[in-house]
From Swiss-Prot:
CDD domains: RNA_pol_B_RPB2. Keywords: DNA-directed RNA polymerase, Nucleotidyltransferase, Transcription, Transferase. This is DNA-directed RNA polymerase subunit beta. InterPro entries: DNA-dir_RNA_pol_bsu_ext_1_sf, DNA-dir_RNA_pol_bsu_external_1, DNA-dir_RNA_pol_su2, DNA-dir_RNAP_su2_dom, DNA-dir_RNAP_su2_hyb_sf, RNA_pol_bsu_bac, RNA_pol_bsu_CS, RNA_pol_bsu_protrusion. The lineage of its organism: Bacteria, Pseudomonadati, Pseudomonadota, Gammaproteobacteria, Pasteurellales.
Length: 1343
């Protein structure tokens, strides 16, 4: 493959053996596509806002003479862009305008003639918009809406697995779950009666539902049972014989016909007997009259003369009724066919416990169950039942639910509506009875075919619909009130309920989460997270093991590795690398189609439901050059997800990639296949906590997944169109777009403004650094600037560190690690953290708070860093306790006399009646002020500092826009110049004239003249647009801010804190090998090799075997080899060897074991490109070892050889303190280490005087409350064990909650008296009060 200019800068050697058939799809699709569907107009009205509007409108008044119809909607442009919203703390949203039509009909006219139509555009609140990176900015913070995995609507058959009843009998149940509406359950009880529940309420016999649907007893029995027909012929009783029904029964009489005995009495009827009966075509047999006794009649038998019912439907037949039937002239009797084996009498038994007898009584019974205490009437009970399952407004199965329903009950696809029909309910009961009879299987709830994904768009739509329904009620009321002549649609609609519903969802739903912005990976994985929690989902407490477990349908859809440790394990999952959702919301994964043992290039996405019928081979199956399987038997997954061996011709599909199974975070772990799953889980989770270091360093040993994640995360700047770099500085990159990618008549210039030193949600620093140079050719989609934790467009979460696995004086006992001072000196793990501190000036009852430098009782030195407005300077270095913003609050104890008030007003002396409430730097923090923002309420006068900031912003905006205009103009005039020169103008002459005059030239060629006129128009457009943009920007900057009620001013101060690595910081590798730094050791004391090169971190070898994460050792070896090759290249560069030698050596490194898919041909590179590549490889040759398809031991050894290193990967080391050789070679290599966001600075804390808990009077706990350390039970036991009685007494009294003792002791210390008098601890009083509250009097006997 050819490499572009940018790609040639650094090429990662790929160890993958299998070609990449399908690139990793865009990683944020699940968020962006879902929201697009929500916002885009859908002509069919199946989804999004359109569907919500169509489901609620038209709203018809109660009398039916007026209706409010929906026409269409549009979204306005948002007022502020994303960046401005973040700074101002506002929501990035667009106003929703809906066109509505109010139609009123003529009451007098019989043909519903239209009397009046009013059309109007109505404002319906704001809809938050998604940014390009799949996030929402709500109140200035970036949030992510996590997708939810919930139970798909449809019908589910399940059993209690014998857990409900003490006998251990398995009780089966069926549940119809709609998308919205009431749930309908059917269940068996231990006596095998069938019951129904609506919305999980009290259970009713299931036949009540059937009666309510209008079925009679006879019809119900016809629906569920086969019949046996008996004939009365004289004194004989003949039975119509269906031989198959007799199988397995014991004959209670001789079965004979035509004089031949087929089965003797007492014998078991077998298949042989049945064959004989069928062969001789026996259709009737004589049965003794006792045989019919106890059988159940299938219909009412009525004495036609007297009208008396001899035997009712579902009544048992006795000798008496038999005689009566014969007497009444019945010759045939139909009874129900049941047996104990596979035709149970469940419905018949249920009818016997059913208290109802017709439709009305059944409806009454349902009404009483749903609305206990209300008297039912025929109308209300009928309406209630219809509204439950048969009203499209109240009940909707949705297309997904209907599809699942039809598949489950083997109905034809695409039939049926969103509501239930009688046939649906009967089919569910039939299938449930079949399952009870031993035919059919129960469903597996954890199967991904029964769980679907609900993404942002769908959840937002549901919330929006809830808001609309609230509005609908109000509109209906309003329409019924009459006087419609004066009303417009505008008056009818109150947007409050809609915006409240939407706001609540985006602001405080359980699934709307504060984005994890530690690093690019944590952003991407947060957006790809799938949660089973949340509204309509599971709760942590109720979720059992089965739901949390890995299911075989997760393969290629949900990652089996990445899930949190702790209470949420298995409930929060991550999407696999290639997975996507289909239209129904089920997860799909791609496969290559296989035809007759030949693997094609065709790729198909299959959902679990589709996949069930196919045999699918693994991605690492061996193929020959014609893509045919080479093995006689191939390992593949067959039915039910079980793996087995299959012939190549039986295989239907093959996996796309070895990385298909895991999520992107797990796919970043090299040699994942050699790690234990539990440790891999920790590794995947800890990469998300890595803090971006000062200088990003790409991993030497990667997996090839680093590039797609960095590009898709949106932290790096990616070229929208190809071109050439025309200008580059720290904050802006300008690209002159290629001719073939420009739209006709535009300037062809793309400008990218970079983000500089801004704060992330996790207080880490976001900063973009250009990685292109002037004149570089750029292709579309290539990286122009690196963001945090990216290096040349590759994800770089940590640093490559030289590690040795050996014990070192106990400093790496139990997962601690010894770090060399050199790591600190080189700032390898130095990170920048940005804190935002804000000060709010409010309008209080006693007067307004004021931001000022005039603070009572504060010395000059404390104010030295403030300006005259009382706000700290940018660039000031501050430490804990320093004032950042001076603020005074009015105190209101003293009532002033009018004379005093006058004097105060004249002399302005007010120091006495205000208290200092300034914003100070929190304890333990120090840093540099990097930015100050002042927000002032509309109508409040801006202070000097605010005006300065405003002026600066205006200047910068004007400068930016002017530069932008200049760049665009230059591009435009270059085109004009070319046009004129091509038309015969003289270049030297042109350059003497003012550029604007060029546009006034005339050209003989008409086509070129048109082009020139077009360019002149564009020039005008540019100027106009510039003026417009500048005006808009000016208005935004000058405009007062929209602050919360009662707030006059907000000042935000941003502090940058530089944190070097220190003992107590937590670090980790990528294999779940985490530890804490125990000591920073001087370089000269670290172990070193023969060349005098010291190691940088010493790790404990005992941390490897028991944890079974061997991947870290392989990574260390491969890292050593990669670095060795880099050292060789570095040596060649230093010796200034000729380029050819360099080229052949690098070529050798890339070609080594070149049986993989990667082909690098350096002969096509120019000398300059080879040198640039070598320069980037001197720190080590980056390698990729894809998950499950990576480098093996032999390949690592070959690479070590090429780097001139021992193939064992072990090196002799010397002790840095004594210079002695260690007694055996040590594993040394390069491991990629991450610094995690668990820094000791944030955790270290010591309490001095602080606040106490109100009730117990004990110090609070935790750093945030400036709390103390709890002296708990175990600590008390320790003191008791030592008999340290006085120490214990102090601990329990004066040092804790003896209030009087505390104060006395303080006074004593002040006066130099070292005594203490312990009193009663407050918690003792508390327990006394608690016991009294139980009604037991307890008093302290003070004798």
């Amino acid at each position: 493959m050819g490499y572009s200019y940018s790609e040639k800068k650094r090429i990662r050697k790929d160890f993958g053996k299998r070609p990449q058939v399908l690139n990793v799809p865009y990683l944020l699709t699940i968020q962006l596509d879902s929201f697009d569907k929500f916002i885009q107009k859908d002509p069919e009205g199946q989804q999004g806002l359109e569907a919500a509007f169509r489901s609620v409108f038209p709203i018809v008044s109660n009398n039916g003479y007026t209706e409010l119809q929906y026409v269409d909607y549009r979204l306005e442009e948002p007022e502020f862009d994303v960046r401005e919203c973040q700074i101002r703390g506002s929501t990035y949203a667009a106003g929703l305008r809906v066109k509505l039509r109010l139609v009123s009909y003529d009451k007098e006219s019989s043909s519903r003639a239209v009397k009046d139509i009013k059309e109007n555009e109505v404002y319906m609140g704001e809809i938050p918009l998604m940014t390009d990176n799949g996030t929402f900015v709500i109140n200035g913070t970036e949030r992510v809406i996590v997708s939810q995995l919930h139970r798909s609507p449809g019908v589910f058959f399940d059993s209690d697995k014998g857990k409900t009843h003490s006998s251990g009998k398995v009780l089966y149940n069926a549940r119809i779950i709609p998308y919205r509406g009431s749930w309908l359950d059917f269940e068996f009880d231990p006596k095998d009666n069938l019951f129904a529940r609506i919305d999980r309420r009290r259970k009713l016999p299931a036949t009540i539902i059937l009666r309510a649907l209008g079925y009679t007893t006879e019809e119900i029995l016809n629906l569920f049972f086969d019949k046996i027909t008996f004939e009365i012929a004289g004194d004989k009783l003949l039975m119509t014989l269906v031989p198959e029904r007799l199988r397995g029964e014991t004959a209670s009489f001789d079965i004979e016909a035509n004089g031949k005995v087929y089965v003797e009495r007492g014998r078991r009827i077998t298949a042989r007997h049945i064959k004989a009966l069928e062969k001789d075509n026996i259709s009737q047999v004589v049965v003794p009259s006792e045989y019919i006794l106890g059988k159940v009649a299938s219909k009412d038998y009525v004495d036609l003369e007297s009208g008396e019912i001899i035997c009712p439907a579902n009544g048992e037949i006795s000798l008496e009724t038999l005689a009566k039937l014969a007497q009444a002239g019945y010759t045939t009797i139909e009874t129900l066919f049941t047996n104990d084996l596979d035709y149970g009498p469940y419905i018949s038994e249920t009818l016997r416990v059913d208290p109802t007898y017709d439709k009305t009584s059944a409806l009454y019974e349902i009404y009483r169950m749903m609305r206990p205490g209300e008297p039912p009437t025929p109308e209300s009970s009928e309406a209630l039942f219809n509204n439950l399952f048969f009203s499209a407004e109240r009940y909707d199965l949705s297309t997904v639910g209907r599809m699942k329903f039809n598949r489950s009950l083997a109905f034809p696809e695409g039939e049926g509506a969103g509501i239930l029909s009688n046939e649906d309910i009967i089919a569910v009961m039939r299938k449930l009875i079949d399952i009870r009879n031993g035919r059919g299987e129960v469903d597996d709830i954890d199967h991904l075919g029964n769980r679907r994904i609900r993404s942002v768009g769908e959840m937002a739509e549901n919330q929006f619909r809830i808001g609309l329904v609230r509005v609908e009620r109000a509109v209906k009321e309003r329409l019924s009130l009459g006087d419609l002549d004066a009303i417009t649609p505008q008056d009818l609609i109150n947007p409050k309920p809609i915006s409240a519903a939407v706001k609540e969802f985006f602001g405080s739903s359980q699934l709307s989460q504060f984005m994890d912005q530690n690093n690019p990976l944590s952003e991407v994985t947060h957006k790809r997270r799938i949660s089973a929690l949340g509204p309509g989902g599971l709760t942590r407490e109720r979720a059992g093991f089965e739901v949390r477990d890995v299911h075989n349908t997760h393969y290629g859809r949900l990652c089996p590795i990445e899930t949190p440790e702790g209470p949420n394990i298995g409930l929060i999952n991550s999407l696999s690398a290639f997975a996507r959702t289909n239209d129904y919301g089920f997860l799909e994964t791609p496969y290559r189609k296989v035809v007759d043992g030949q693997v094609t290039e065709e790729i198909e996405y299959l959902s679990v439901i589709d996949e069930a019928n196919y045999i699918i081979a693994q991605a690492n199956s061996n193929l020959d050059e014609n893509n045919r399987f080479t093995d006689a038997f191939v390992t593949a997954r067959g039915e039910r997800g079980e793996s087995g061996l299959y012939k190549p011709e039986d295989i239907h599909y093959m996996d796309v990639s070895t990385q298909q199974v895991v999520s992107v975070a797990a796919a970043l772990i090299p040699f994942l296949e050699h790690d234990d799953a539990n440790r891999a889980l920790m590794g995947a989770n800890m990469q998300r906590q890595a803090v971006p270091t000062l200088r990003a360093d790409k991993p030497l040993v990667g997996t090839g997944m680093e590039k797609p994640i960095a590009l898709d995360s949106g932290v790096a700047v990616v070229a929208k169109r190809g071109g050439t770099v025309q200008y580059v500085d720290a904050s802006r990159i300008v690209i002159k777009v290629n001719e073939d990618e420009t739209i006709a008549g535009e300037a062809g210039i793309d400008i990218y403004n970079l983000i500089k030193y801004t704060r992330s949600n996790q207080n880490t620093c976001i900063n973009q650094i250009p990685c292109v140079n002037l004149g570089d050719p750029i292709n579309r989609g290539e990286v122009l600037a690196d963001g945090p934790s990216t290096d040349l467009g590759e994800l770089a979460l940590g640093q490559n560190i030289r590690v040795a696995f050996m014990p070192w004086n106990g400093y790496n006992f139990e997962d601690s690690m010894l770090v060399s001072e050199r790591v600190v000196q080189q700032d390898r793990f130095t990170t920048i953290h940005i804190q935002e501190l804000s000060c709010v000036a409010r309008d209080t009852k006693l007067g307004a708070e004021e931001i000022t430098a005039d603070i009572p009782n504060v010395g000059e030195s404390a104010l030295s860093k403030l300006d005259e407005s009382g706000i700290v300077y940018v660039g000031a270095e501050v430490k804990g306790g320093d004032i950042l913003v001076g603020k005074v609050t009015p105190k209101g104890e003293t009532q002033l006399t009018p004379e005093e008030k006058l004097l105060r007003a004249i002399f302005g002396e007010k120091a006495s009646d205000v208290k200092d409430s300034s914003l100070r730097v929190p304890n333990g923090t120090s840093g540099t002020v990097i930015d100050v923002q002042v927000f002032t309420r509309d109508g409040v006068e801006k202070d000097k500092r605010a005006l300065e900031i405003e002026e600066m912003q205006l200047r910068e905006a004007k400068k930016d826009l002017t530069e932008e205009l200049e760049i665009l103009e230059a591009g435009l005039f270059a085109r004009v110049r070319n046009l004129l020169i091509s038309s015969g103008a003289d270049a030297a002459q042109l350059d003497k004239v003012d550029r604007t005059k060029w546009l006034e030239q005339t050209i003989a060629d008409e086509e070129k003249q048109n082009q020139l006129e077009q360019l002149a128009e564009q020039y005008e457009e540019l100027r106009k647009e510039f003026e417009h943009k500048l005006e808009v920007k000016r208005k935004k900057i000058i405009k007062g801010d929209d602050l919360a009620p009662g707030v006059l001013k907000v000042v935000k101060v941003y502090l940058a804190v530089k944190r070097q690595i220190q003992p107590g910081d937590k670090m980790a590798g990528r294999h779940g090998n985490k530890g804490v730094i125990s000591k920073i050791n001087p370089v000269e004391d670290m172990p070193y090799d023969e060349n005098g090169q010291p190691v940088e971190i010493v790790l404990n070898p005992l941390g490897v075997p028991s944890r079974m994460n061997i991947g870290q050792i392989l990574e260390t070896h491969l890292g050593l080899a990669a670095k060795g090759i880099g050292d060789q290249i570095n040596a060649m560069l230093k010796q200034k060897q000729e380029v050819e030698k360099l080229r052949s050596y690098i070529q050798k490194a890339y070609d080594l074991l070149g049986n993989g898919s990667q082909k690098v041909d350096l002969s096509t590179f120019t000398d300059e490109e080879v040198l640039r590549l070598a320069g980037n490889l001197r720190k080590g040759l980056p390698v990729a070892t894809p998950v499950f398809d990576g480098a093996d031991e032999a390949e690592i050894k070959e690479l070590l050889k090429l780097g001139g290193l021992p193939t064992s990967g072990q090196i002799t080391l010397y002790d840095g303190r004594t210079g002695e050789k260690f007694e055996r070679p040590v594993t040394v290599g390069y491991m990629y280490m991450l610094k995690l966001n668990h820094l000791v600075d944030d955790k270290m804390h010591a309490r001095s005087t602080g606040s106490y808990s109100l009730v117990t009077q004990q110090p609070l706990g935790g750093k945030a409350q400036f709390g103390g350390q709890r002296f708990g039970e175990m600590e008390v036991w320790a003191l008791e064990a030592y008999g340290a009685a006085y120490t214990l007494q102090e601990m329990l009294t004066v040092k804790s909650d003896d209030v009087n003792g505390r104060t006395k002791m303080y006074k004593n210390i002040v006066s130099g008296n070292q005594h203490m008098e312990p009193g009663t601890p407050e918690s003792f009083n508390v327990i006394m009060k608690e016991i009294r509250s139980l009604g037991l009097n307890i008093e302290l006997d003070e004798e």
